[in-house]
Structure formats: C-alpha cells, structure tokens
Amino acid sequence: MTDNAPITFDGKRFAAHLSTAPGVYRMYAADDTLLYVGKAGALRKRVASYFNGTPKNTRLTAMLAQVVRMDVTITRNEAEALLLENQLIKSLTPRYNVLLRDDKSYPYVLLTREAWPRIALHRGPQIVPGRYFGPYPGVTAVRDMLNLIHKLFKLRSCEDSVFRNRSRPCLQYQIGRCSAPCVNVVTHDNYTEAVHRVTLFLEGKSDLLAEELIQAMQVASEHLEFEQAARLRDLLTSLRSMQNRQYVDGRAADLDVLACAALSGHACVLLLSFRDGRNLGTRMFFPKTNGEERTAEILSAFVSQYYAEYPPPPEILLDQEIPDHTLLEAAFSRSSAHKISLRWNVRGERAGYVELAVRNAQVALSTELTSQRAQRVRSEAVRQLLGLEGPIKRVECFDISHTMGEATVASCVVFDAVGPVRSQYRRYNITGITPGDDYAAMRQAIERRFRRAVEEDKQGERPDVLFIDGGAGQLAQAKMALNAVGVESVLLVGVSKGEERRAGHETLIMLDGQELHPGAASPALQFIQQVRDEAHRFAITGHRARRQKTRMTSKLEDIPGIGSRRRANLLKHFGGLAGVKAAGQTEIARVEGISTALAAKIYASLHGLSKNDAANASRVS
C-alpha cells in the first residue's frame, strides 16, 4: 500500500459500534475539513442510515465520498443534542450544512442601570449594565422607537462624559426631547417615574401604562396641579394615537412570522416581527445552502440557529410544517421564561401575516437572484478582460484616506462572484510613516493584511485579483509589500482615474506596464468601479471616525498652557468641545483659570487662526 493511497471509511462498521443514545455526529474529509454536523435521537440508527443503500441525492453522494472519519458526542437528551448541533454549526461552519449568514449583530434598546438612566441604541456584546429590549429586526425600528420615547418621556441619550460636564441644558432640552437631568431641571423622583413608564412601554404593557397615566392625571387634578394634569393628558393622547397608528392587531402581541422561498438553488428566509402588536418590519436572510434541501429543511435550520442566539417570542408563525418542530418547541421553551409555540396552517389575520411574509420572501429572492446574475456577468467580464483561466472567486481592493496626512486609514474590501462580503472587510490605522505618504501607507496596509494570512496559512482568504486604487506608483508599492511577505500568486491591478478623473474613463494598469481601457459601457469596468468605490467609501468613513476621535481627545491638550485641570473646566463650562468651539473669546475668558491671552490662544487654535486674526476676531466678539 503506497503513502498516497486514498483513505477509505467503513461507515457501516463505525455505526455498528455506536451507542443508541442521543447525540451529535461530525464528518471530516482527508484534510480534516469539517464536512457536516448533525444531531440524532439515536446515534447508531442515524449514522447507519447514511451508509445503507444508495444516497438519495447528488449532494449526499458528493459529501459521503469525501468522508474519511467521524466522531460523535453523546448528550443526555435530544434537545441537548439540538443545542449542541446549533452551537457547532455556528462556530465551525461545516461545508454541507445550511448556514445562517448574518454578519450584523441585531440592534437593541438599552436602558442603563444608573442614578439617571440613559436610553440608546445598542449593538454588540451586552456588557453595559442595564436592561436590553429586543432584538429588533433592523436599526430603523429602533430609531423610530427611540424618537417616540424621547418625544413622550424625555429621557436623556447623552454619554456620561457629556452628562457629567454640562452646566446648562443642551439642544435636546430646547426642542422638548429631554428633561435636562444633567442640570437638575427635572427632579430625581419625576425622572425615575419617567424611566418606569418607559420600561412599561418597552415591555409591551401599553394598556397598563395608559391606566397609570389616567390615575396620575386624576391625582394631579384633585391636588389642583392642572399643568401636570395637562402634561399627563397630552402624554396619554400621544400614547393612544401611537397605538392607533402602529397596532395591526391587538391580539397579535409578540410574535414572529417566517416564510421561506427557494429558486435555482438559492433560498430566502423572511422574518416579520411584531412586538406588543406593533409591526417592527421585515428582515431578509439568504442562507448558504447546497441547492437540494427542501424549503422546510432550510426553514428548520434557520429557526434552530436563529433562536439559539436571539430570544424567541411566545408565538412563531411558519408558512409550512418543519422537521423537528416539537423538539424545537421544547428546547426553546426550556431555555425561555415562557412557552414557545410554532404554528402553521393558521387562519384569520395571522394567515394574512403569513401570506404577506411569503410574498415578500418571493420578491426578495427574485431581486437577489437578479442582482447576483448581473454581478456574475460583470465578474465573468473581468475574468475575460484580465485573461484569467478560472472563474473569479474573490477580489480585494485597497484604498487610503487622510486629511493632509492626519488620521490615515487604509481600507480593504472583499467581493466574491455575487457581491460584497462585508463580514471580511478590514480597516488599518496607519502609524509610523511620514504624514501624507500614500505609498508607505499602502505598503504597510498590504503587508499587515497578507502577513497574517501567511502566518495563519489561510490560502482560502487570498484573492484572485487585488485592485489598488492608484497608478503605477501605488501598484509598485503593493508588489513590494507582497514580495516582503512571500505572496506571489495574487494578480495585481492598478485602477487609475487618469488626467480627466472622469468616471468611465479609468485605466487599468498591469505590473508589466500594460494599460487596459475597458470603456464606460464595459461590464468589467462597472464591476471594478463598484469595488473601487466601496473601498473608497469604507476608507473615508474609517478616516473620519478616527479623525473625529483624535480631535475630540487631543485638540485642547495640544494648546500650550492647557493642562488637564483647565481642559476639564472648559469642557464642564461649555458642555463639551463643540461648546468651547462655538464660544467667543470673551466667553472663554470667563472660565476659571483662563486669562484673556489664553482665551485668544484657545480661540485661534480651535479655529485655525493666526494671532492677528484672533485679535481681530476678539474685537468683533
């Protein structure tokens, strides 16, 4: 037997020695790639079913042909196996499982736990002490909710650093969206009462909130506090108006509606969410499938993965029956504080919700496939233009952004054959170079990106084509960076706007000096423009954020004569750097520890003026 003889796996023999207990099984290829993760109520029976007879479809045939080993984990019950399966699928992303691809964390409403709580939109890890309400299907729903809360209940939204340093109410107070707890315009008792009402509102207890408002209004009237009674009356009117606008069905309470559409090997799962009877909108998911799963299987995989991460509502409506629905209900109910019900074949208004979700899923999938087809045509045009042998699987593009050398940021965006892969975008804060040296910035960014790929041996993350936003000089720097880390298999292409800098007149520059002029109507150039423009957008937004952060933290410290104490006095007096910048020299000089001369220096520095200009401004102010 030679060293390179194929490895065979005797699945029947492996299955015969397995336990009949519930658990999770994993299948691996020769290179240790994880092919598939599955759960079973009885491991021996489930695993044996793969190797008894002919596989039922080509996907299964292809997968089993690659299996060289398996391992299993026994669990106490099938529900525990389901949870472990979901965890492994999410963390290990097996090749042949249906994968929920969602590179965004869901937005929540955060109500902080402190003396004067603030309310805000929150994404990411829940490490800030407080209550988190959600998740919501999209950021628009959260912003609409927060706008309503600020209008009705006037809770603060400012960060603690701003809250602690204010000496007068901010603009939010002036426009009636905050009660100015920062300067004690509202009493602590009244603010706490507002927080309580917001909590009821976010918990979906609008009817209970309305009852409390009516009682409070009656008490205020009995005590002849007519202004307070009028405010409560207006709040109650606004609340009822909001209920009339937003409640689709008072009986709907908290529920999610899910529908799945599939076409040409692609799938879309649409989520329609209601909380407290309010329609919070829809969200579309396009899970990675292998093209042969039934929609019920796709929907089942989605339900198990999605609600393993996000808390399910008491009622989930489906457009069809799914496998393991009883097991899923039991698992979700066990991990939640309430019973979870999965329902299909519903009637009345709920049937209307399901029908709406089905139509939206079909439209979303059709739109996505049209977009993907157009993207594939453009990708193929790029392949032909550049003379590549195989299809393009991955392209990357780098761009540099700075303001006269300040806060330099490099971006790297990633596209595959069907569009952007935003979860793999990267930004690089550039340091240790001469300000404004774009060549050095490009070289540093590319070295950092590919050195990590080389060190971690991530061949799959290397692009077929690497576009550089720039001409021959930038292209040469990119080549030097790749040589420095030992990467040779990446095709480098410079994208130059040319002398006229007009869209559609870009020139593609190759390493050998060859220039390509695709023309404005070229599908290849349209693809390249999309990639280049996305890299530019991603670089600029990163640069602006870094520049703003730098300026907010260091602008005052850079002024001679301003130490930590004077800086604190200025920020406290004016409520932040923006307030200092908006003030005149005379007003700045009124701050403790700030002389007239120092005020002039501060004003000049913040406005980029010379001493003479500052003196003239002083006479005007």
Swiss-Prot record:
GO terms for molecular function: DNA binding; excinuclease ABC activity. Residues 207-242 form the UVR domain. Keywords: Cytoplasm, DNA damage, DNA excision, DNA repair, Excision nuclease, SOS response. It comes from the Bacteria. It is found in: Cytoplasm. Residues 20-98 form the GIY-YIG domain. One of its GO terms (biological process) is nucleotide-excision repair. GO terms for cellular component: cytoplasm; excinuclease repair complex. Pfam families: GIY-YIG, HHH_5, UVR, UvrC_RNaseH, UvrC_RNaseH_dom. Interacts with UvrB in an incision complex. Belongs to the UvrC family. The UvrABC repair system catalyzes the recognition and processing of DNA lesions. UvrC both incises the 5' and 3' sides of the lesion. The N-terminal half is responsible for the 3' incision and the C-terminal half is responsible for the 5' incision. PANTHER family: UVRABC SYSTEM PROTEIN C, UVRC/OXIDOREDUCTASE. This is UvrABC system protein C.
